[in-house]
Amino acid sequence: MELINKKIMVTGGCSGIGRELVEKLIAEGSLVGILDINKSAFSEIEKISPNVYCMECDITNPSSVEDSVEKFHKLHGSIDILVNNAGILYSSPLVGITLQGLKKHGYKEWTKVIDTNLNSLFYVTSNVVEKMLEQRVKGVIVNISSVCSAGNAGQSAYSAAKAGVNALTSTWSKELSSIGIRVVGISPGYIDTSSTRKALSVSNIQNIRQEIPLKRLAQVSEIIDAILFVIKNDYFNGKILEIDGGLIVS
């Protein structure tokens, strides 16, 4: 699939991987719609190109999602590709030992991570696929997962959410492939971003680097290259592409 003139929706496109992905898609000639709650970044991003359209959207709110998808669809008449990129990191053991005593993983934090990283995926994808089916679009759904989907100490909510993302990728591929919609996933390892540095201590990051055979974190551009690969390769379907520098095999 070529990207020129394709109508693409990206969740969480105002920062991090999403922001750089949007710029790359624009350079490829795509028409991009961003779903993001960070309205303050819209004016700067929309200066990049007239072909990017920002929509304030709480992806954990089904009504907000439905309205945003409808707006983009009315603007361009169709939706070809969805990249479910938005997500948050949160690290906490199930029950931690602190100087003040035992501390359980917060229920509020659990719900927020699951809502943002998993439930939102269902809300956005169901609305986009509905539009695709109405117009018989042969589209692509890209879900951003994580190597933590296999389980990672201290990340109960995040790991559970990303495991769910993998399950939905497989399930939706089995449902939608016969009608021309591919569903694929990207499973990055640890990426050199501000959110990673915020979620993990310096010593944790140093230890992670030593566990990765390439001895470094991934660059955002390397993850974006993988996203573009799974979109453009028409025979890649129903699978999760791991981009982790060899972390899993080590």
State each model region's role.
Residues 57-68, 107, 222:
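The beta1-alpha1 cofactor-binding region of Rossmann-like NAD(H)/NADP(H)-dependent oxidoreductases
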Residues 177-182, 236-238:
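Short, small/polar-rich loop/turn modules that mediate ligand/substrate recognition or access, typified
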Residues 216-243, 248:
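C-terminal substrate-recognition "lid" of short-chain dehydrogenase/reductases
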Residues 3-33:
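Canonical Rossmann dinucleotide-binding motif of NAD(H)/NADP(H)-dependent dehydrogenases/reductases
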Residues 88, 102-123, 142, 165:
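Catalytic Tyr-X3-Lys loop
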Residues 130, 173-175:
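Alpha-helical segment proximal to the catalytic Tyr-Lys
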Residues 125, 161:
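Active-site helix of classical SDR
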Residues 89-111, 154-157, 197-200:
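Conserved mid-core segment of classical short-chain dehydrogenase/reductases
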